[in-house]
Amino acid sequence: MSSPSITAPGAAQPPSAPAQAPSAASGAPKPGFAPLTGSQLVLGTVALSLATFMNVLDTSIANVSIPAISGDMGVSPAQGTWVITSFAVANAISVPLTGWLTQRFGQVRLFTASVLLFVIASWLCGLAPNMPMLIFFRVLQGLVAGPMIPLSQTLLLASYPAAKAGTAMAMWAMTVLVAPVAGPLLGGWITDNIAWPWIFYINIPVGLVAAGLTWSIYRSRDPGPKRVPLDRVGLVLLVLFVGAMQIMIDKGKELDWFNSGQIVTLAVVAVVSFLFFLAWELTDKQPIVDLRLFARRNFVLGTLSLSIAYGLFFGNVVLLPLWLQQYMGYTATWAGLATAPVGILAIVLSPWVGKNVGKIDPRKLATVAFVGFGGVLWMRSHFNTQADFMTILIPTVLQGAAMAFFFIPLQAIVFSGLTPDRMPAASGLSNFVRITAGAVGTSLFTTLWESRAALHHAQLSESVNRGNATATQALNQLAASGYTPEQALASVNRLLDQQAYTLAVTDVFYLSAVLFFALLVLLWAARPKLGAAAGGGGAH
């Protein structure tokens, strides 16, 4: 995550801008936390990457298992979706609290405790005897997961010398981007071949290894806790605002959005509590969330660019396998095989991006990502029902190149000019906005897909009548094959559904491509300084 005008949190000052490294008085870490070397560096990187991958994986691994979970628990699939919603709501609430929690408990203590509690919550999820208990344990899992991603970023960057901070950020970014793609594939395979509780049990060995390695390597590098007051009013308002907003986002499509009194109520609660939250946090002496970060040009523009782009990316990550499985006849495994190769070019190119992000304007690198994503989505906008596996695979592979240029330069812009003491708060806040944007993108895109499919279905249905020679011939052929009139019409309707949902998904792909190109305007409004820091111990 190094970049012009960036310093990775906790890393040493960049050689490119020694004059800009903050002094101890400015909040820089106390001397003594030199970069890790040798086996400690390797094991530390593995531990932090495992924890991050495990965390992000859990945001999507349960998605394809909802039918199995609902069936076992004796509830409807709609009720089963609370397994996803409960985690998302709790996680969204706890992520922006990372800054305060870090001051109160210390980085390493908080991270290690979060991982261990995540393991315990995962174990309890697998043991849950009924849906209310499973939802409760998912809430617990989401709450303790919040600090893991921001702190893994901070600790990882503090482990590397400034010259290699970009490479460290590249590895971190890959876990965040690849895990949501791997989640549905892994979750589907486990559910089909073992049992759904194992989508939670697999976290236990991974988490124990990650926590053990992290504590053994990093415990002596923790600056320790500070006595800071708890902003109770801010916390209550945050819970109300984020909780209502996240439930509204997750349940909006299911409840028909603002035609539902429940959604309207949630929207009112979210807006009112958000306004009170803003007023309180901007005037409180010890705010639980440092909203003053949004006064910084690079932070706000970088966060918006990253979050909107992530919302577009994540919404399409969810939509593509849904279309493949529901309307193209793909199994969960084959849909996974069609989307998994996205990591190939990303893994190949990310080290180069990390190495050069401090030498090249991060806006130029991020432009490659936005143009790449836009080009891939434009290719997908030409899909049809005859698209074969290779036609679907090629854009997926190319998307990996865009992913390599995505996180690293954008986070370089986000953290540009920040001192190390503000890094945990900045990382938590930017990750909160990004995660929320991912949820919004998923909800809006699935809703748009359904509405466009209904429109296309209505238009296509107009041509299915006895006055249309092609439709008449198809119905006659079905009748000659022994279909009753009702069966023939049902068969034709399935074909219309396939065409309608395919046209609708290409509409979404096209819109996403346009939005990625439009985001370039927002990106280039940022002003990172080339040659400023690239690590975390300097002015991030």
Regions found by a protein language model. Give the residues of each.
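Glycine/proline-centered helix-kink
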Residues: 150, 171, 176, 180-188, ...
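Hydrophobic alpha-helical segments of secondary membrane carriers
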Residues: 171-175, 305, 429-433
